[in-house]
Structures are given as C-alpha cells and as structure tokens.
Amino acid sequence: MSASNATHTHLSSSGGASQMATTQGHLTASAITLNFRELIKEPKGLEDAANYLFQGLLDDVVAGIFIEIHHLRKTGNLTALDGVGEENAESAYRICEMPNLDIFGISTAKKPMDCTCPHCDRLVAAARFAPHLEKCMGMGRISSRIASRRLATKEGASASSSSTSTYIQSGGNTGGTDDEDDVDWSSDKRKKKSTQNSRNNGSKKNNGKIF
C-alpha cells in the first residue's frame, strides 16, 4: 500500500500527462508505459517503478480472470468447462450394459403399434389394420358380396311390404276378379293340351309312314 501511495504521489508531482491517460482507475498499456518511463528517470524511483509495474500487471490479470469467470457463469459454460466429478458421473451417467437395452437403459425391443379404426373406434394391431378396415367398411370381395346380399334382402322386404300395403288398400282387388283369373288359367291349360295332342298325332303318322 505504501508503494502504491508513493507511486501516486510521484505521479502527481511528475506531471499531468499520466493522469490524462488514466480513466476511472483503469490504466491502458500506453498509460502504464508512460508512467513507468517517468518513474525510472530518477534512480530513487526504481523500486517504486517496479512495484507500480507489478501492481498494474497483477490488477490486469486478476480483472481479466474475474471477467472471464463471470461470463462463463452467466452463460452456463462454467460447469461444462470444469466437467463433472467421477463420483457424480458414475452415479448419474452410468452406462447400461443389460440385454435389449441401450446405453441409457431404454428398451430397444420393437413394440407392437396399435391403430384406431375410424369406423368402429377399436384398437387394432397395425399388421391387421388394413383387413379390419376393409371388413369394417364393407370394401372387400366377400364383404361386398355380403353387403349386396343384405341390400337385396332389404329391397325385397321393402318391395313385399309395399305390395301387401297396396293390396290391403285396394281391398284385395288387384285389377281383376277371381273368375277372370280362373278363365285365363283354364284357357292356358287347354292350349297346352291341344299342342301336346297335335304333337302326338304327328308322331303316330310318321311311325305308320303316312305322308
């Protein structure tokens, strides 16, 4: 402390050039060089000059280290620079060597993936999702046949129900009487018999060679 006080008093007496180069207690390289040259002009001030130079260099080094550590701590790089201790590394970052597990202890076995059917909202395995969706939506060959059969039966049932309803509404008369139906049936039967008789007669004449 005495050396620094003596240095400051000597600087104040030597001139104001060094004070102009000093800004808020922080000395630049040119200011330190200028002050050192002024101190070594006199033989009595050699010790003060050496102390002054050493103190300036020490302050500069300490300030640089302090600023660097402060920057590393604020940015979070101080831990990365220092590293992790061996005890903490073994406990927190232990490598897993078990079968079917990676180095972090996560299972490497392939898990079966499930898919949700958009039609019935059921969970189906991914390998069977396509056939299930085909059957569920009636888009396959067999499913389309079954769906067409169901549609045909529904249409037949609706047609039969509509015909019965029209028959009931008309009071059982569908355009003709029972007598007319009987006459048509008997006339058709007579026509069939006449055609059969004519065929039989023609075959008998051919057998008897009557032309």
Swiss-Prot record:
Outline the residue ranges of the record's SGF11-type zinc fingers: 115-136
Q: Which UniProt keywords apply?
A: Activator, Chromatin regulator, Cytoplasm, Metal-binding, mRNA transport, Nucleus, Phosphoprotein, Protein transport, Transcription, Transcription regulation, Translocation, Transport, Zinc, Zinc-finger
Gene3D superfamilies xrefs:
Classic Zinc Finger
Where is this chain compositionally biased, Low complexity type? 157-166, 197-211
A Pfam family (short name) is Sgf11
A molecular-function term among this protein's GO annotations: zinc ion binding
Q: Which GO terms describe its cellular component?
A: cytoplasm; DUBm complex; nuclear pore; nucleoplasm; SAGA complex
Location within or outside the cell: Nucleus, Nucleoplasm; Cytoplasm
Q: Does the keyword Glycosyltransferase apply?
A: no
- Domain remarks in the Swiss-Prot or TrEMBL record: The long N-terminal helix forms part of the 'assembly lobe' of the SAGA deubiquitination module. The C-terminal SGF11-type zinc-finger domain together with the C-terminal catalytic domain of not/nonstop forms the 'catalytic lobe' of the SAGA deubiquitination module.
Quaternary context: Component of some SAGA transcription coactivator-HAT complexes, at least composed of Ada2b, not/nonstop, Pcaf/Gcn5, Sgf11 and Spt3. Within the SAGA complex, Sgf11, e(y)2, and not/nonstop form an additional subcomplex of SAGA called the DUB module (deubiquitination module). Interacts directly with not/nonstop. Interacts with the AMEX complex component xmas-2. Interacts with Cbp80; important for promoter recruitment of Sgf11 that is not associated with the DUB module.
Which family is annotated?
Belongs to the SGF11 family.
Q: Per its database record, what is this protein's job?
A: Component of the transcription regulatory histone acetylation (HAT) complex SAGA, a multiprotein complex that activates transcription by remodeling chromatin and mediating histone acetylation and deubiquitination. Within the SAGA complex, participates in a subcomplex that specifically deubiquitinates histone H2B. The SAGA complex is recruited to specific gene promoters by activators, where it is required for transcription. Required for nuclear receptor-mediated transactivation. Binds independently on SAGA to promoters in an RNA-dependent manner.
Q: What is this protein called?
A: SAGA-associated factor 11 homolog
Taxonomic source organism: Drosophila mojavensis (Fruit fly)
Gene expressing this chain: Sgf11
